[in-house]
């Protein structure tokens, strides 16, 4: 739907941004909400809204008693002083060195990095590697992740077993 996630520096993650497609809602950690109490409130509000849109009257019991614990995170995108290769995209064998080299070669755009290094072009479409790759490119350029930009995000997916891809054995 071309909805572009936005970077949330507080949680070091992308969250849904702008308007979601009609009928789509996001709650809890997928929406950047952490802490048990906050997640329960988010789930309650989102479920209530969805059910009322479907014409159901909503009557929930009281939410369970819970508290949010303080949460914090630290960005750790790669080991800076490692002596060996530091892999970023395991499916395409892209390393931190490859990303830094692409920047040195003048590939400053995220899309150029993607094509130069094949970062995020494997079967997972970058779902396991792009954030670390974007962070390393941002570090090279002295910019933030939002200033660096993103590639086009693919819709959520359900993993498929290797057996389903292999077909029948004879």
Regions found by a protein language model. Name each.
Residues 1-170:
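Residues forming the flavin
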